[in-house]
């Protein structure tokens, strides 16, 4: 499969995330076949991010007309036409909660492959957002030999890519403008203000 196709599949996988901030998807491909996918979220049985954020009052109702005025796309829909986004002033509180309660897409994809007995030695990982340093270390240890990502995480510390390159992993960026099979109006990524 072409890198642009698999990366767009990663964006579709990201839509399963219940995170009210970033929806991230990862796909592990080997020999032209998808062997694992993952998205960011709470471990099975845990409280979903969007539910916790709603309980804490971190979400703002942004009707559809507000999106046209420059706000980010919908994040959470509670069975109505209302749309909710993470309020900017709660982003740091969300990050603290997320770091304790959510697993990143990259790690979920690696864990699901292991759980299913699929070798990822020599595989390629496609991810919608650049990995954090901890995920970069997990990728470096996993046997993956190539990482393809689309967007750069705005809070990422420099050096995540050095972790991968120092482990002999090729790192490639595919700009979003090269991904033309999806209707981007229907894909939610960052759900904050």
From Swiss-Prot:
Cofactor note: Binds 2 Zn(2+) ions per subunit.
Taxonomy, superkingdom: Viruses
Entry's EC annotation: 3.5.4.12
Residues of the active site: 106
Domain CMP/dCMP-type deaminase: 1-171
BP GO annotations: cytidine deamination; nucleotide biosynthetic process; pyrimidine nucleotide metabolic process
Keyword Metal-binding appears in the UniProt entry: yes
Keyword Zinc on entry: yes
Reaction equations catalysed: dCMP + H2O + H(+) = dUMP + NH4(+)
UniProt binding sites for substrate: 153
Cofactors that this protein relies on: Zn(2+)
Binding locations of Zn(2+) 2: 104, 132, 135
GO terms for MF: dCMP deaminase activity; zinc ion binding
Keyword terms, alphabetized: Allosteric enzyme, Hydrolase, Metal-binding, Nucleotide biosynthesis, Zinc
Notes on how activity is controlled: Allosteric enzyme whose activity is greatly influenced by the end products of its metabolic pathway, dCTP and dTTP.
Biological role: Supplies the nucleotide substrate for thymidylate synthetase.
Subunit structure: Homohexamer.
Name of the protein described by the UniProt record: Deoxycytidylate deaminase
Organism: Enterobacteria phage T4
Name of encoding gene: CD
